[in-house]
Structures are given as structure tokens and as C-alpha cells.
């Protein structure tokens, strides 16, 4: 091993580049000292960051509303959406598993998600219960500014019956402090709308969704 015997003195790795003396690496020998490299760091393996730490971008310029400059998380994976009425999963709903799946990527607090969900039987219906899609691996942050619109495709003839609803557009919303998507039909003027009920859902529902949101 390499050991510095002199108290409170840095260890400096120096060299000669074309006749010029350069400092390649400085090791601060204090208890919480840093290693400072003169140039880029190249790794043949993974860079492992302890929990609670990350990449600090405080050297960059800031927006007026900046609250953090630490990139402390990255994750990607799969998730499985489920059908809910009034917040409860429909236990006897049957899914076409070949078309019921999702993927996500989480960078910091931002989560980007896609999924498709397809039924073969929607199961037991309770009148006037709202319709939701759940199963999200993360909950949105508890801040009304973080509500997220959902981009969706309702497959014709295998989706949601809107004949009894306000004439307009089917919309999805992930509210704040939520782990499920709710659905509404808004009229074209944007002045009225109503929630989609589970009784409006077809037995062969087939939806595809894409959305992003901020976690807590």
C-alpha cells in the first residue's frame, strides 16, 4: 500500500508532458478528502455511487427555481399495469398477457413510462365506479404542480364506450401523490367533462399509454 507519513499533507502525482511539468492527480489527506484528477476519468467497469450520493452539477449555471443539482438515481425496468374501479384492482378481470406490459426509465426524479393493456374479460362491474389503470412502480410527488397528462390510444371497437359521455376527447391524468391513472372525457371547448366509469369499459379493452411524471 501507499501511505503518507506527514500529517495534513496532500499526495500529488506529477509527470512530464512534452517538457512541461503536470499534476495528474491530487489526493487530499484530510478525513473527508477528495481525489482531484487533472483530466477525464476512464473506467473499464461500472462506476458505483453509494446510496444518497450522486453526480454533482453545482458548477453549472442555475435556473431561478433550482432546488437540487445532484443526479442521484437511475433505474430502468418492466412493470405490469392492472385495471381498477374506484381505486381497487378488479380481481376477476382477465388479461391478454401478450399485450399487457410496460417499461419505464427513471432518471433522478423524472420517470418516463409506456405500457399497453388488453382485456379478454373485464370482470365484475359495480355501477358508477370510476375507471383507473394502476400498477405503477412509483408514486407521483405530493405537489399539485406535478400533475401529468397521459398520451393514449384507444383502439377502436376494443376500448371505452363514450356514447353516453360528453362528446369530446378521452384524456388520461396522473394526479399528484398518486400511483394510478384516471380517465375523463372533456368536451371540445374545454368547459365541461366527466369521469369515465368502469361500466364504460369494454370486455376487450385495448389501450396504449405513454407518460412521464415527477416522483417524491
Regions found by a protein language model. Give the residues of each.
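Beta-strand-rich receptor-binding modules of extracellular spikes/adhesins
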Residues: 1-49, 103, 110
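Short acidic, glycine-rich loop/turn motifs
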Residues: 4, 15-17, 59, 83-89, ...
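Surface-exposed ligand/attachment interfaces on beta-rich extracellular proteins
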Residues: 19-20, 59-70, 78-106, 116-142, ...
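Residue-level detector of buried hydrophobic side-chain packing
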Residues: 27, 111-115, 136, 211
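Glycine-rich, low-complexity segments
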Residues: 32-92, 141-145, 208-216
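Short, exposed beta-strand/loop patches in secreted or surface proteins that constitute
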Residues: 47-48, 101-105, 169-176
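Extracellular attachment/recognition segments
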Residues: 138-186
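Domain-scale recognition of soluble eukaryotic interaction modules
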Residues: 176-216
